[in-house]
Amino acid sequence: MSRLVQTMLLWLKSEKGFDTTEASDGPELQKSICDKRWSPCCTLVRLYARMGLHRYNLLKLSRVKKYNMSTHYAAFATTHRSNGKYHDLSDLKIFESSEDVEPPNEVSLNVINVIVYIVYKDFYESRLVRMLIAKLLLNEASMSIMDASLSRVEIRLSNPIWVWSDIYECPTQKLNDMSFSYIPETYLVIKIKSTKY
């Protein structure tokens, strides 16, 4: 390990993270530690480093997980979908589901708003990162989706710019074991387990 990398790692330990907007060594840190082929950074660390996440602790993955949960970010899909290769959907997981509870009325007596964060992992390449958020309005009496909207957040690692796009008009369909199985472009399967508070 080079002397510069050792110095940077010691600095990170003492500062408990880094902020590229304030630290003059931010770009050099990313270049020296996170861009080498055999660097100590894993894909997730490189993602956060290139995003310049405020005071991200490079050495503790548990801090990243805590940050994700505290700000309601889901884990990211690390896949390059434009190559047309098959992507394994076996690692699809639900990260979190939450319900917006409102006082009952005639319209919302049997309705629950569910926000689902989707974890999708495949291990091809980490050049395009996606987070899918499905917002479903469920009618428990008929077990049907009254309204649904999907949003996608993309982070391109080569040029870390946030791209937000909303996808609407998803087909209304009966639910089978609380599942909603259509997402444009990706065709993933969401399984929801919701409980009333």
UniProtKB/Swiss-Prot annotation:
InterPro entries: MS5 (IPR006462). Belongs to the UPF0725 (EMB2204) family. PANTHER family: BNAA09G28770D PROTEIN (PTHR31260:SF39), CYSTATIN/MONELLIN SUPERFAMILY PROTEIN (PTHR31260). This is UPF0725 protein At5g41640. It comes from Arabidopsis thaliana (Mouse-ear cress).
